[in-house]
């Protein structure tokens, strides 16, 4: 009688490596603006840190735009530096 086995580690690893959906492309946004605070909050952790590309699924260019926009929004007091 054949025993059903769980998928091998290699198969599970391939399934786990699916790229994340790019939230900026999904929303149709080409450039990130520091005044769009609701959008920027999606890229900030609950501790106030900018989330990494691996977490957000952004391209390198978009990640740089988001980082600059978040820093500008912090300087303009639209976003807090920390979240207490």
Curated annotation (Swiss-Prot):
Pfam families hit by this protein: Ribosomal_S18
Protein name per UniProt: Small ribosomal subunit protein bS18B
Species, as recorded: Nocardia farcinica (strain IFM 10152)
PROSITE patterns: RIBOSOMAL_S18
SUPFAM superfamilies: Ribosomal protein S18
Gene Ontology MF terms: small ribosomal subunit rRNA binding; structural constituent of ribosome
GO biological process: translation
Family under the similarity heading: Belongs to the bacterial ribosomal protein bS18 family.
Keyword terms of this UniProt record: Ribonucleoprotein, Ribosomal protein, RNA-binding, rRNA-binding
Compositional bias per record (Basic residues), positions renumbered to this chain: 1-10
Subunit structure: Part of the 30S ribosomal subunit. Forms a tight heterodimer with protein bS6.
Gene Ontology CC annotations of this record: cytosolic small ribosomal subunit
Spans annotated as Disordered: 1-20
Disulfide bonds: none
Top-level taxon of origin: Bacteria
Function: Binds as a heterodimer with protein bS6 to the central domain of the 16S rRNA, where it helps stabilize the platform of the 30S subunit.
InterPro entries: Ribosomal_bS18 (IPR001648), Ribosomal_bS18_CS (IPR018275), Ribosomal_bS18_sf (IPR036870)
